[in-house]
From Swiss-Prot:
It catalyses: (4aS,6R)-4a-hydroxy-L-erythro-5,6,7,8-tetrahydrobiopterin = (6R)-L-erythro-6,7-dihydrobiopterin + H2O. Pfam families: Pterin_4a (PF01329). It comes from the Eukaryota. Its EC number is 4.2.1.96. It is an enzyme of class 4 (lyase). Belongs to the pterin-4-alpha-carbinolamine dehydratase family. One of its GO terms (molecular function) is 4-alpha-hydroxytetrahydrobiopterin dehydratase activity. This is Pterin-4-alpha-carbinolamine dehydratase. It comes from Dictyostelium discoideum.
């Protein structure tokens, strides 16, 4: 079953508060900053493994200790529950690295 766009109520409930809407696009974004490149790459590796399992891949950009991520679902041309799940997983991985 193809993913569907989030309703306004779902958006308010499911989009993590620390993620921002992308201007001019139905997508969310966040920049994660790490101690160093190794920590950033470790985060990206963990996310990549989950993304492959979910068949839901982020758009991302990495320079040294910073990873900029944008999430949207191409199959429905906007935000779906897959994006909010992925955002929650990324936040969890980030928090685990900073305990």
């Amino acid at each position: 079953m193809a993913p569907t766009l989030l309703t306004e109520e779902q958006r308010k409930e499911l989009i993590p508060k620390d993620w921002e809407m992308v201007v001019g696009r139905d997508a969310i974004k966040k920049t994660f900053t790490f101690k160093d490149f190794n920590q950033a790459f470790s985060f990206m590796t963990r996310v990549a493994l989950v993304a492959e399992q979910m068949n839901h891949h982020p758009e991302w950009f990495n320079v040294y200790n910073r990873v900029e991520i944008t999430l949207a679902t191409h199959d429905c041309s906007g935000l779906s529950v897959n994006d909010t799940k992925m955002a929650d997983i990324m936040n969890q991985f980030f928090n685990q690295l900073h305990q």
